[in-house]
Amino acid sequence: MMEGLDDGPDFLSEEDRGLKAINVDLQSDAALQVDISDALSERDRVKFTVHTKSSLPNFKQNEFSVVRQHEEFIWLHDSFVENEDYAGYIIPPAPPRPDFDASREKLQKLGEGEGSMTKEEFTKMKQELEAEYLAIFKKTVAMHEVFLCRVAAHPILRKDLNFHVFLEYNQDLSVRGKNKKEKLEDFFKNMVKSADGVIVSGVKDVDDFFEHERTFLLEYHNRVKDASAKSDRMTRSHKSAADDYNRIGSSLYALGTQDSTDICKFFLKVSELFDKTRKIEARVSADEDLKLSDLLKYYLRESQAAKDLLYRRSRSLVDYENANKALDKARAKNKDVLQAETSQQLCCQKFEKISESAKQELIDFKTRRVAAFRKNLVELAELELKHAKGNLQLLQNCLAVLNGDT
């Protein structure tokens, strides 16, 4: 009856919903290519098949695959953070833990309420919830793949022994999740780090570049955090509107099937309009979630990683200044001068090493995020225009049918 929009699924196609959905403008390198070729959900666990192609001499084979779980990704991330050799680099943020509880709860509630709805309504809602679950699953896989690709693209981190073990060792890494005691220890470490961060933040940086970056990143992180929360609200609003269209369309359809009068035919035609409009609105929500919300969430975590880098450098600067003071005291007292000089030299070398790599890391971070935001925002704008035109076409076709023009 109404043309201008196909009757495809409510969620994005396989191509759009694929593992490349979260775009961070990664630079590919033929020497080491990593992707997640498959994933399997087993209750509360997801098993990722990590596929690697490499021409590097460090690996025994040119192509291989291993199965990894989320805890092993966290282990790899933590090993980077805890390694002093990587203090001058932005450590790619760890992927978030897979969370399907909300989708499972919706499916459970749907099953409990099956008796209160028609077979068609139940089938439609079941398909939508299953598609929603699949979308979350694909997003989870994508975020884990992005982490690996960021590491593989990094000229230093890609050489890490733990990373090679993660990619190549075809047995279980025997990594477990942290227990309550370890989580409590992490909590206190973060408290100490926060308090220490207040102390080092009051130290005037000797380099204007880093002073500017510290001020900028603090503001940038807060703005991205605020934008992420607002983007989520916007996405939920579109999803809520789609749900409302569904309920209105179902009610009109029920009215339209009561009789064969003209008013009932009118109800059926308008019901079809709401059904197709619902599909567009659901796609709008999905597009905004993929192209904007996911990107903001990723760069919220990566900007925190950049802030952590600046904290490590500031901490190193404070240690260097304290070492200088200790050396002056040792010389004044003519006691333990050699030990103080050695400590001062080590602190100086560490600070200079971190500063050298940190500057390039922050420059690359800016280039990467600007390219990613430009690409995703342009694509989102094009999709919004496409959906707006689709809505307009639907309304025009519906009016033409109701007016008897077609």
Curated annotation (Swiss-Prot):
Protein name as annotated: Sorting nexin-6
Residue ranges, annotated region (Membrane-binding amphipathic helix): 182-199
Residues carrying Phosphoserine: S116, S194
Modifications the protein undergoes after translation, according to the UniProt entry: In vitro phosphorylated by PIM1; not affecting PIM1-dependent nuclear translocation.
Recorded GO MF terms: dynactin binding; phosphatidylinositol binding; protein homodimerization activity; type I transforming growth factor beta receptor binding
Coiled-coil zones: none
Localisation: Early endosome membrane; Cytoplasmic vesicle; Cytoplasm; Nucleus
Main subcellular location: membrane
GO terms for biological process, alphabetical: cellular response to amyloid-beta; cellular response to epidermal growth factor stimulus; intracellular protein transport; negative regulation of DNA-templated transcription; negative regulation of neuron apoptotic process; negative regulation of transforming growth factor beta receptor signaling pathway; regulation of postsynaptic membrane neurotransmitter receptor levels; retrograde transport, endosome to Golgi
PANTHER family assigned: SORTING NEXIN FAMILY MEMBER, SORTING NEXIN-6
Subunit structure: Forms heterodimers with BAR domain-containing sorting nexins SNX1 and SNX2. The heterodimers are proposed to self-assemble into helical arrays on the membrane to stabilize and expand local membrane curvature underlying endosomal tubule formation.
Entry keyword Transport: yes
All copies of domain BAR, residue ranges: 203-406
Native source species: Mus musculus
Region (Interaction with PIM1): 2-179
Taxonomic lineage from the root: Eukaryota, Metazoa, Chordata, Craniata, Vertebrata
